[in-house]
């Protein structure tokens, strides 16, 4: 009997009371934690009443605060902005769904909280900075040598494969970029900011919610035609791979070289047999030439203009995990404004979103820093036609919402 009591006391120890509340209250709180529900006062206490000194940054979906739970675990608490128009029940249902997404290379959502008009998400706290804070800083990029970069590429591929094919719902991220990749204490990459579009209703414009993605990473069919599929994430991944290999940011490269993008530059060198010139020279000494060439080829295949010509993340993961045999040659990369033969059948799991509005890269981070860049907004449809556009987008999305790469799960955007 004593052992049983000690076991029970150990369970409730993290919830030790500061006042004489009933034992039933503690049991209810334990049960709530099992269901990933965090009491508001626990989060208030953990973040010191959301004190400015605990603020990690401000992302497109609201501020993020660092906190510490009574059991000693560090957390990142995202307070969703009031732009979210979802009711409590809808928010809870979506949060429960996202909380089921568990993978080594995806930032884990530990739970959620609703309090009045406040809606909060509780994530694991990732110690190191986002990838862009390391990769694009001249005094820091050498901290991640080629071996680490290759492992980061492989980890991101596995995380995306999970979101696309193995998660409870097929999740299209829509904003894969260096700022949304967090690195833990062992430099293991974790995809952040996934599934956030599900927490916002369709009647909120893309400009306000920043769910359309980030300039320089978006697939051309998504930018120009509003066609969204898992292949849009594949394109963004390809851009990120080329950035990791070269140590250069696509958007910054275009500013220095107005006549071409990082993708076009890499493609030209690849076709000339000068692939190793693409490599970041700061890490050349640690690089494996065969791995570099493989990553460049995979990156270029992922950024093909025709989404049907891009590999799936499953194939990418397989190519990275073993020495490939024959790997097809990539064509010229796709960029917004480029042309490809549009097929009558959309890519698997594609949904038309109508006319898109694109924004810059304000990032929601759950680690030690937050990246908040601003890009150029592209105005969407006139106000008079927005309603019909949303209606068409909703119908189109609904027609494909039950399909995914395996045709088994609902799609999440």
UniProtKB/Swiss-Prot annotation:
The modification Phosphotyrosine is found at residues 123, 222. Residues 321-413 are annotated as: Disordered. InterPro entries: CR_Ser/Thr_kinase, Kinase-like_dom_sf, Prot_kinase_dom, Ser-Thr/Tyr_kinase_cat_dom, Ser/Thr_kinase_AS. Keywords: ATP-binding, Kinase, Nucleotide-binding, Phosphoprotein, Serine/threonine-protein kinase, Transferase. The active site is at residue 175. GO terms for molecular function: ATP binding; protein serine/threonine kinase activity. It is an enzyme of class 2 (transferase). SUPFAM superfamilies: Protein kinase-like (PK-like). Residues 50-335 form the Protein kinase domain. It catalyses: L-seryl-[protein] + ATP = O-phospho-L-seryl-[protein] + ADP + H(+); L-threonyl-[protein] + ATP = O-phospho-L-threonyl-[protein] + ADP + H(+). PANTHER family: CYSTEINE-RICH RECEPTOR-LIKE PROTEIN KINASE 3 (PTHR47973). This is Cysteine-rich receptor-like protein kinase 43. The gene is CRK43.
